[in-house]
UniProtKB/Swiss-Prot annotation:
Renumbered ranges of HAT repeats: 52-84, 86-118, 120-152, 154-185, 187-218, 220-258, 260-294, 304-336, 338-372, 382-418, 420-451, 453-485, 487-521, 523-554, 574-612, 617-650
Subunit structure of this chain's protein: Associated with the spliceosome.
Organism: Pyricularia oryzae (strain 70-15 / ATCC MYA-4617 / FGSC 8958) (Rice blast fungus)
Classification via Gene3D superfamilies: Tetratricopeptide repeat domain
Protein name: Pre-mRNA-splicing factor CLF1
C-alpha cells in the first residue's frame, strides 16, 4: 500500500547517457507529420466559366456577409476579392455597404483609402479621407494618413490646411510636433514659431517650452531663446508653482552658460531655488553646485551650500514653527553667512513663535532664542541699544507670576556692566529679586558684588537670601566663607551656629561639615568635639562616629621648640586612645540598640584603624569581634518569604550558648528534684501498706 502512494521514486538520479532536447523532439514530430492536401489549381477555359466562378464566389461572400454582417473580416475579404477581379465599382460598393455597418472602424477606412490609392483614384481617396476625419476627428491615424497623402502629392498648402483643421481639435503633442516639423522641412520658420505659440498655449508643459527654445537656438537668435524661456516662466507661474519645473531653469541656465554669460546663469539658478519648493528643486541645486564648482569661486560654492541648507530649514519651520531647535540651526547658519539683515530677520521670526501655554517646560528652549538674539546684537551686530531692547522685550514677555528665568536677568545685568552702567545692572537684579525672588538670582547678584568687592552689599544680600529661603544650606556655608575670608571669625561662627539651628535644611550635613571643618582648621578642637557631640545627639550615624574618630587621630600634638612644623608628626598614644574610645562608644551604642549593619560598619572602620595605627594584639581583638554572614528567611505581610543577610557576632553567640547551658542545667535540676520527690512519695506509700 505504501509503495503505491505518490509518484514512483527514481533510484538512480544521475544524468542519462543520451540527452534528448526540445529541439530534437520538435524536429522528429515535424519529420513524421503527413503532408497536407493541396488544393488543385483551377483553370478557366472561357469567359463563361469565369463568370460562373465569379457568380459563385459572390454568392458565397454575400451569404457570409448576410449571416455575420458584423464580422469586418468578411467584408474586407469580399472587397479585396473584387479588387483582384478588377471590379472597382463592385469593390467600392462593398466598402460602402461595410461603412454603413462599421462606420467607426478605423481599419475599414484605411483599407478603403488604400484600395482607392492602389487604383490611382486620388480624388476618391481624398474624399474618403475628408469623410473619415469629419466622422472620426479624434483618431490621429486618419489625420496622419490624410497629411501623408497630400504631402506625397506635393500639395503643401493642402497639407497645411489639413493640419489647421486638425489643430482646431487640440490633439496631443505628437500632432503639433508633426505640424512644426512640416514647416521646418520647407523652411517656414515664422510659421513654425506661430505654431509653437499656439502649441504652448494648448500644452503648457515645460518640456514643450524647452522644445521651442531648442528650435530657436537652432534657427533663431539668443534673444529669441531668452524670450522663450522668460515667457515660459511667466506663463507657467500663472497656473501655479506646481506647473513650474526645475528642468526649465536648468535648460535656461545651461544655455546661458554655453554663451559664457555666467552672471545671468547664476541669477537664473538662484531665482529657481528661491521660487521652487525644496522637494522639486533637488536636481536644480545639484546643477547649481556643479556650475559653481566649474565656473565659480570659493564664495560661490559656499553660497550654494548656504542656499541649500537655508531652503531645508525654511521647509522645516514651515512644517513646524514651534521647533526651536531648527530655529537655532537656522540662525547659526545665517550668522555664519555674515548677512546681518537676514540674521536679524530669522531671529525676529523665531522669537515670534511664542509657546502656546504658560508651562515652563515649553519655554525652556524658546527663551534661549532671546538670549542668543541679544548676544548676537551686542557682539556681532555691534548694536547695544537693540540688544537692550531685546532683553527688555523678553523680560516683559515672561509671565513672572507663574515662573521666571534667572539666566535672562543675569544676562541683562552682565550686559549693563559691559556697557559700563553698574547702576542699571543693580537695578535689574534688584527688580528681579523684588518681583520674583529665586536662589539663583541671589547667588548671581552676590557673586557680582563680590567681584566688585562690595562686601557690605553682599552681607545685605545674604540676609535677604536667608530671609527668603532659610533652608538653603549653600547660602549659610557661602556666607560663613565670606566672613571668614574677611577675617571676621566670630561672625562666621555665629552664622554657622544659626545654620545648624534651623529646623528645616535641604542638606544639613553640609552645614555641619562646614562648621566642623571651620573649627578644626582654626584649631578650636574642644569646640569641634562639642559640635560632634551635638551632631551625634541629632544623627547617630556610623559615618559621624568614624569622622569623629578620624578627627581625634588628626589632632596635632604640641611640638617642642626644635621640632619642624613641616615634618609629619607621628600619631601619639593619647590620640589613639581617644580614637579607640570613640569606636568603643559607637560599637557599644549600636550593640545596645541591636543595629547590626551600623555595628558592622563601625567594626570595619575600627579594624582599618588598628591595621594602620594598632598592634597585632589590637588587630586580633577586633577580628575576634567581626561577625559572620548568614542567610535567613522571613515571612512578609503577603504570606511570601524573602531571603536576607544577617550577621551573627561571636560575643552574642557566646552569650547565647551560656544562656542555653544555664537553661539546660535548670531543666536537669528540676528533673532531678521531680524524680527525688517521686521516690519519696513511693517510699511513703510502701510503709503505710506494711502497717
Amino acid at each position: 500500500m505504501e509503495a503505491s502512494r505518490g509518484p514512483p521514486r527514481v533510484k538512480n538520479k544521475a544524468a542519462a547517457p543520451v540527452q534528448i532536447s526540445a529541439e530534437q523532439l520538435l524536429r522528429e514530430a515535424t519529420d513524421r507529420q503527413e503532408e497536407a492536401l493541396q488544393k488543385p489549381t483551377q483553370r478557366f477555359e472561357d469567359l463563361e466559366e469565369l463568370h460562373e466562378y465569379q457568380g459563385r464566389k459572390r454568392k458565397e461572400f454575400e451569404s457570409y456577409c448576410q449571416r455575420s454582417g458584423f464580422n469586418l473580416k468578411n467584408w474586407l475579404q469580399y472587397a479585396q476579392w473584387e479588387l483582384e477581379q478588377k471590379e472597382y465599382a463592385r469593390s467600392r460598393s462593398v466598402f460602402e455597404r461595410a461603412l454603413n455597418l462599421h462606420a467607426n472602424k478605423v481599419t475599414l477606412w484605411i483599407r478603403y483609402v488604400e484600395a482607392e490609392l492602389k487604383s490611382r483614384n486620388i480624388n476618391f481617396a481624398r474624399n474618403l479621407l475628408d469623410r473619415a476625419v469629419t466622422h472620426l476627428p479624434r483618431v490621429d491615424k486618419l489625420w496622419y494618413k490624410y497629411v501623408w497623402v497630400e504631402e506625397m502629392l506635393g500639395n503643401i498648402p493642402g497639407v497645411r490646411q489639413v493640419f489647421e483643421r486638425w489643430m482646431e481639435w487640440q490633439p496631443d503633442e505628437a500632432a503639433w510636433s508633426a505640424f512644426i516639423k512640416l514647416e521646418q522641412r520647407y523652411g517656414e520658420y515664422d510659421r513654425a514659431r506661430e505654431i509653437f505659440t499656439r502649441f504652448t498655449m494648448v500644452h503648457p508643459e515645460p518640456r514643450n517650452w524647452i522644445k521651442w527654445s531648442k528650435f530657436e537656438e537652432e534657427y533663431g537668435t539668443s534673444d529669441r531663446v531668452r524670450e522663450v524661456f522668460e515667457r515660459a516662466i511667466e506663463e507657467l507661474s500663472k497656473y501655479g508653482d506646481e506647473f513650474v519645473e526645475e528642468r526649465l531653469f536648468i535648460a535656461y541656465a545651461r544655455y546661458e552658460a554655453k554663451l559664457h554669460d555666467l552672471d545671468r546663469a547664476r541669477a537664473i539658478y538662484k531665482f529657481g531655488l528661491e521660487n521652487l519648493p525644496r522637494s522639486k528643486a533637488m536636481l536644480l541645486h545639484k546643477e547649481y553646485t556643479t556650475f559653481e564648482k566649474q565656473y565659480g569661486d570659493r564664495e560661490g560654492v559656499e553660497d550654494v551650500v548656504l542656499s541649500k541648507r537655508r531652503r531645508h530649514y525654511e521647509d522645516l519651520v514651515r512644517e513646524n514653527p514651534k521647533n526651536y531647535d531648527v530655529w537655532f540651526d537656522y540662525a547659526r547658519l545665517e550668522e555664519a553667512s555674515g548677512d546681518i539683515d537676514r540674521t536679524r530677520e530669522v531671529y525676529e521670526k523665531a522669537i515670534a513663535q511664542v509657546p502656546p501655554t504658560q508651562a515652563k517646560r515649553h519655554w525652556r528652549r524658546y527663551i534661549y532664542l532671546w538670549i542668543f538674539f541679544a548676544l548676537w546684537e551686542e557682539t556681532e551686530a555691534k548694536n547695544p541699544e537693540r540688544a537692550r531692547q531685546v532683553y527688555d522685550t523678553c523680560l516683559k514677555l515672561i509671565p513672572h507670576r507663574t515662573f521666571t528665568f534667572a539666566k535672562v536677568w543675569m544676562h541683562k545685568a552682565h550686559f549693563e556692566i559691559r556697557q559700563g552702567d553698574l547702576a542699571a545692572a543693580r537695578k535689574t537684579l534688584g527688580r528681579a529679586i523684588g518681583m520674583c525672588p529665586k536662589d539663583r538670582l541671589f547667588k548671581g547678584y552676590i557673586e557680582m558684588e563680590q567681584k566688585l568687592y562690595e562686601f557690605g552689599r553682599c552681607r545685605i544680600l545674604y540676609e535677604k537670601h536667608i530671609a527668603y529661603n532659610p533652608a538653603n544650606c549653600s547660602t549659610w556655608v557661602k556666607w560663613a566663607e565670606l566672613e571668614r575670608g574677611l577675617d571676621d571669625l566670630d561672625r562666621a561662627r555665629a552664622i554657622l551656629d544659626m545654620g545648624i539651628a534651623q529646623p528645616v535644611l535641604d542638606m544639613p550635613e553640609v552645614v555641619w561639615k562646614s562648621y566642623i571643618d571651620f573649627e578644626e582648621e582654626e584649631g578650636e578642637y574642644d569646640k569641634t568635639r562639642s559640635l560632634y557631640e551635638r551632631l551625634l545627639d541629632k544623627a547617630d550615624h556610623p559615618k559621624v562616629w568614624i569622622s569623629y574618630a578620624q578627627f581625634e587621630i588628626n589632632i596635632p600634638e604640641e611640638a617642642g621648640e626644635g621640632a619642624d612644623e613641616e615634618q609629619e608628626q607621628p600619631v601619639s598614644d593619647e590620640a589613639k586612645a581617644r580614637a579607640r574610645r570613640v569606636f568603643e562608644r559607637a560599637h557599644q551604642g549600636f550593640k545596645d540598640k541591636e543595629m547590626k549593619a551600623e555595628r558592622v560598619s563601625i567594626l570595619n572602620a575600627w579594624l582599618v584603624f588598628e591595621k594602620t595605627h594598632g598592634s597585632a594584639e589590637d588587630i586580633e581583638k577586633i577580628e575576634k569581634q567581626m561577625p559572620r554572614r548568614t542567610k535567613k528567611k522571613r515571612k512578609l505581610d503577603d504570606d511570601t518569604w524573602e531571603e536576607y543577610v544577617d550577621y551573627i557576632f561571636p560575643a552574642d553567640e557566646q552569650v547565647g550558648k551560656n544562656l542555653m547551658n544555664m537553661m539546660a542545667k535548670a531543666r536537669a535540676r528540676k528533673q532531678a528534684e521531680a524524680e527525688a520527690a517521686a521516690k519519696a512519695a513511693a517510699a511513703d506509700d510502701g510503709g503505710e501498706s506494711g502497717e
